[in-house]
């Protein structure tokens, strides 16, 4: 066998590596053991949260998972959180246990409907496909605001006057992108009140070799400071959550400063988890630092 077939040009553990012949091979998924951590939909007996999967686009194959809190009384209407998962744009899924369990908790604690988009992943689908899929999903969701969309749960249970976009890490980047797109190009139907960005992943001053490989341009998608539409971002408030020991903390802090200087007329909230690292609430959900982080998000959603 020709040993050159195994020569790599790029290696980005724990995500993927690129061979000299152009092949791309993913490392074992850090969010699930070979698919064994996929969680089926149904009723969560401990929380009363129900889940189902929906097809957003048959053409692209993009789907999403819906989370509905326990229903008490007739004709309930809940705020909606449109969520985008993390994973450096190249791994993760709302169907994985690590994200599913977190979103069950969010639906329960905030008493909201959550829809989490399973966008296509880089590098097999080059950036900005993840962002384009996520914006298309937001438009599909918005088509339900008149009660006539294709998904009954969205028609029946969502108060489209109270919509939020949210995400962690790369998903926070996508949530920001969707909010800016909604403000710059318009989004008919829903009232997007705010954005929740947890441990956001934006471009920084130091080179990021993996991002440079996946998206080799200093584009507004990764660098909000060069986005001429930043001040048009939809919503009246943003919550940025960082972790003290997260290597991305400075980028979250910088995002707050950039947004405040942009001319955007909303309020910028900031929450920091002490002594914790990137995505700790996913990897260690029993940490006592998860409770105040969740409370910050719940309060942000439920406060007028």
Q: What kind of region is each of these model predictions?
A:
Residues 2-304:
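Alpha/beta-hydrolase superfamily serine-hydrolase fold, recognizing
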């Amino acid at each position: 066998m020709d040993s050159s077939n195994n020569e790599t040009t790029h290696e980005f553990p724990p995500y993927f590596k690129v061979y000299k012949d152009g092949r791309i091979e993913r490392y074992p998924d850090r969010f699930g053991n070979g698919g064994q951590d996929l969680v089926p939909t149904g009723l969560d007996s401990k929380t009363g949260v129900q889940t189902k999967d929906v097809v957003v686009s048959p053409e692209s194959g993009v789907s999403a998972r819906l989370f509905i809190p326990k229903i008490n009384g007739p004709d309930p209407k809940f705020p909606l959180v449109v969520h985008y998962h993390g994973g450096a744009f190249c791994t993760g899924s709302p169907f994985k246990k690590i994200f599913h369990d977190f979103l069950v908790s969010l639906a329960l604690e905030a008493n909201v409907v959550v829809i989490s988009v399973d966008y296509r992943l880089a590098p097999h689908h080059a950036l900005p496909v993840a962002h384009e899929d996520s914006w298309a999903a937001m438009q599909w969701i918005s088509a339900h605001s008149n009660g006539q969309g294709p998904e009954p749960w969205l028609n029946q249970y969502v108060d489209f006057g109270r919509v939020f976009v949210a995400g962690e890490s790369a998903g926070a980047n996508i949530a920001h992108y969707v909010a800016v797109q909604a403000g710059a190009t318009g989004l008919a139907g829903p009232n997007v009140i705010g954005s929740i960005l947890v441990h956001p992943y934006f471009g920084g001053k130091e080179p990021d070799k993996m991002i440079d490989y996946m998206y080799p341009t200093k584009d507004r998608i990764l660098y909000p400071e060069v986005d001429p539409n930043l001040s048009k971002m939809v919503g009246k408030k943003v919550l940025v959550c960082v972790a003290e020991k997260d290597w991305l903390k400075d980028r979250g802090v910088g995002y707050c400063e950039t947004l405040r200087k942009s001319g955007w007329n909303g309020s910028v909230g900031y929450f920091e988890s002490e002594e914790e690292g990137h995505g700790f609430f996913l990897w260690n959900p029993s940490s006592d630092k998860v409770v105040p982080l969740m409370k910050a998000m719940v309060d942000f959603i439920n406060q007028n």
